[in-house]
């Protein structure tokens, strides 16, 4: 069985979040949380929160054993982009793109194959 958790509209660029998510894919739950705890990136706290949420969903909704869980899948999709303007010289303006992310984590209790 598998359980999942999703965090949407997170105000961090998807490219930066993917660097963190790639570190934990396929790892055991406790190992993934330890990696995230010692990763010096802003996205690691958000990803850890989603991992803990997926584990709680597995425990409470599906009665799965927390010690058996591993990260089956985790991926980051791009959310909407906020456009802001920055004044430049000679009366011009540049568009600043504030990117958002949707983070999905799927945990499972047994490896397939």
Curated annotation (Swiss-Prot):
Keywords: Ribonucleoprotein, Ribosomal protein, RNA-binding, rRNA-binding. GO terms for cellular component: cytosolic large ribosomal subunit. It comes from the Bacteria. The keyword Oxidoreductase does not apply. This protein binds specifically to 23S rRNA; its binding is stimulated by other ribosomal proteins, e.g. L4, L17, and L20. It is important during the early stages of 50S assembly. It makes multiple contacts with different domains of the 23S rRNA in the assembled 50S subunit and ribosome. The globular domain of the protein is located near the polypeptide exit tunnel on the outside of the subunit, while an extended beta-hairpin is found that lines the wall of the exit tunnel in the center of the 70S ribosome. Belongs to the universal ribosomal protein uL22 family. Part of the 50S ribosomal subunit. This is Large ribosomal subunit protein uL22. It comes from Pelotomaculum thermopropionicum (strain DSM 13744 / JCM 10971 / SI). The gene is rplV.
């Amino acid at each position: 069985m598998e359980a999942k958790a999703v965090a949407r509209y997170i105000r961090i660029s998807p490219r930066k979040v993917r660097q963190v998510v790639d570190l934990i894919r396929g790892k055991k739950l406790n190992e993934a949380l330890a990696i995230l705890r010692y990763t010096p990136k802003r996205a690691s706290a958000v990803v850890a929160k989603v991992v803990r949420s997926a584990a709680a969903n597995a425990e409470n909704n599906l009665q799965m054993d927390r010690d058996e869980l591993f990260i089956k899948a985790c991926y980051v999709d791009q959310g909407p982009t906020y456009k802001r303007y920055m004044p430049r010289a000679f009366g011009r303006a540049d568009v600043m793109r504030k990117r958002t992310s949707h983070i999905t984590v799927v945990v499972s209790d047994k490896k397939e194959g």
